Amino acid sequence: MRLILLGTPGVGKGTQALELSECLHILHISTGELLRVEMENKTPIGMKIDKYMNAGELVPDTIIIDMLEKRLQEPDSRKGFVLDGFPRNLNQADYLKSSLERLQTPLDRVINIEVPIDTVLNRLLQRNRADDTPETIKYRLEIYKQETIPLIDYYQRAGILEQINGDASPEEVTNRILACIG
């Protein structure tokens, strides 16, 4: 099973990705975690990433694409995966489609988790990440509207999009996702 989780920052994509990877025995690939590891290790790429994330900006596609390409080529990703935090725009979606076609591992489903904006704001402010200040949250939500919302139409046209109400307990959201992917 190869899945993508979409939704605004704070809808619980990371939580759901972990649950789904355990339930389905597939790999959880978090681009956010890949980025944070680079920053924590203070690699040259990590220092570039740090500047973008602390400003609340999206990391350039070229950086994300290079990191993900390497990860998808590792043997454990062939069993299946759930992508958390990628793609975030149409360019990345096109890249991912091409990459998965080359690897002969097409996507099975894209899950869009929907949560009311007030709930999202509360969740983001409570998770105590350095990059979750009110200013960066507002900016990231605006970027999401501009860059990521078009992905919903993209995957709807591809016939693999499922919409999930994420305004529930994590367990209930997991059950809803599992029910829709069969």
List where the protein language model places each region.
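Glycine-rich phosphate-binding loop of ATP-dependent small-molecule kinases
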Residues: 1-182
